């Protein structure tokens, strides 16, 4: 399948595909229905069927362009289903809001769960403003696990942008993170704290189908992502109630309860006063293009209630095995996390004292401390210095030259060129912090 090590899910699904001739069944019948009892022959179904992002799918699914959807409480359909939606990449201004003065139990510097993020969003008026509802009329209603009810729908074939499959759902289990009802709407929320490129449409569609039949008012479906002090909220609508793939973005907005004001003078002050550090031994030069995801990984490690191994990072968040290596190594390179080994010799990641201190700081200090961590390294400091002098972002060739001048060890020029993209990504993140008007 791949030169990379197989996960437990990879191995278990390969056995099931062989045992039940799943590929042949799909090619002849269009789909294959597998029961929870059959899946349990190898592993617990809850571990084998939850793939919130395309990148999390087992290798045999990825290789054959397959996906899995629950259709009853104990059955799942496997086929060439187009089940994920790419987030729209739009940069938006951040709307500042505040918690009421009397709220003492919510610490905006330490929001560690989806539930806390939702509670803070309600208390600060974010939810009411986004939904265009009156704050005093907004009521938290249905949430948690429940039955989907019965409905049928069409879903696109992954090779063809048209609804080729018809599936029947009967009492599948669904989960709603939050629902808010006002005078005009019932709004169903899916909330996440991990950053990703896509999401599983089912997380919005199945709850929408259930509650569309139960209430007379309009039902909205909303995706909320909270990371690094910023809420990103997206409302989606389904143009055709019977078409799983008919969703489209209605609107999106960013909010923060914290003061997000950072000036270029703040950034220049960090650059001017930073103390350089030598390149760390035995930690590779970063190959992790999104610095937002480096931060997000640290947040997820901080809030984890269990030992966070490399396999759990790969299984639970929007990383494949290679990206888990890249992003954990990038955070280690900056001194934000450390790697140890458990009794099974699995890598385990925890925050360093520096990482914990930064993550529990207010928004401005947190961002500037992250800048400091980056700019302590010569290549990044020199890249930002050159950008500030010219106002023009460097090219990959420019960055390779800076890496060669810094005598970065252990990588050839071709690898330097690949890793130059991370330098450009991190410098772009620093520059984008400037929101001075």
Task: Give the label of every model feature segment.
Residues 110-117, 167-174, 199-203:
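Phosphate/oxyanion-binding active-site loops and adjacent basic polyanion-contact surfaces
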Residues 191-215, 393, 399-407:
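Short, hydrophobic/π-rich interface segment
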Residues 185-187, 192-199, 211-241:
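Nucleic-acid nuclease catalytic cores
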Residues 71-154, 331:
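Long, mid-chain structured domain cores
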Residues 97-98, 175-191:
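Glycine-rich, often proline-containing surface loops adjacent to acidic residues and nearby aromatics
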Residues 1-111:
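Nuclease-adjacent, charged terminal/linker segments that flank catalytic cores
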Residues 135-179:
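Active-site metal-binding core of divalent-cation-utilizing nuclease and nuclease-like domains
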Residues 245-437:
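Donor-sugar nucleotide-binding helix/loop cap in glycosyltransferases
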């Amino acid at each position: 399948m791949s030169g990379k090590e197989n996960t437990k899910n990879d191995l278990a699904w390969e056995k099931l595909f062989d045992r039940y001739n799943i590929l042949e069944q799909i090619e002849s019948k269009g789909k294959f229905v597998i029961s929870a009892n059959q899946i349990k022959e190898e592993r617990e179904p809850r571990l084998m069927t939850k793939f919130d992002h395309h990148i999390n799918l087992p290798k045999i699914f990825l290789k054959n362009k397959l996906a899995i959807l629950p259709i009853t409480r104990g059955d799942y359909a496997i086929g060439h289903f187009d089940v994920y939606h790419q987030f729209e990449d739009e940069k938006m201004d951040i709307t500042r809001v505040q918690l009421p003065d009397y709220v003492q139990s919510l610490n905006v510097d330490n929001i560690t769960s989806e539930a806390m993020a939702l509670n803070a969003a309600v208390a600060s008026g974010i939810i009411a403003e986004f939904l265009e509802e009156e704050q005093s009329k907004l009521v938290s209603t249905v949430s948690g696990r429940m039955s989907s009810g019965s409905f049928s729908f069409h879903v696109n074939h992954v090779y063809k942008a048209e609804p080729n499959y018809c599936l029947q759902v009967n009492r599948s289990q669904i989960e709603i993170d939050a629902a808010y009802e006002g005078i005009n709407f019932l709004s169903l929320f899916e909330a996440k704290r991990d950053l990703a490129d896509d999401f599983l449409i089912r997380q919005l569609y199945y709850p929408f189908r259930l509650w569309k039949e139960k209430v007379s008012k309009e039902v909205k479906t909303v995706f909320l992502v909270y990371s690094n002090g910023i809420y990103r909220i997206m409302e989606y609508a389904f143009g055709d109630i019977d078409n799983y793939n008919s969703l489209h973005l209605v609107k999106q907005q960013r909010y923060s309860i914290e003061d997000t004001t950072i000036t270029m003078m703040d950034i220049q002050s960090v650059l001017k006063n930073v103390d350089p550090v030598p390149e760390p031994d035995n930690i590779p030069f970063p190959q992790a293009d999104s610095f937002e995801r480096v931060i997000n990984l640290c947040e997820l490690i901080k809030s984890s209630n269990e030992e966070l191994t490399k396999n759990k990072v790969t299984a639970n968040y929007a990383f494949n095995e290679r990206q888990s290596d890249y992003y954990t190594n990038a955070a280690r390179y900056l001194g934000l996390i450390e790697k140890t080994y458990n009794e099974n010799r699995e890598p385990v990641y925890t925050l360093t004292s520096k990482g914990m201190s930064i993550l529990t700081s207010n928004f401005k200090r947190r961002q500037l401390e992250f800048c400091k961590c980056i700019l302590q390294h010569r290549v990044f400091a020199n890249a930002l210095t050159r950008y500030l002098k010219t106002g023009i972002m460097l090219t990959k060739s420019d960055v390779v030259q800076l890496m060669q001048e810094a005598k970065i060890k252990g990588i050839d020029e071709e690898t330097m060129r690949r890793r130059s993209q991370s330098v450009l990504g991190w410098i772009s993140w620093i520059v984008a912090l400037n929101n001075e008007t």
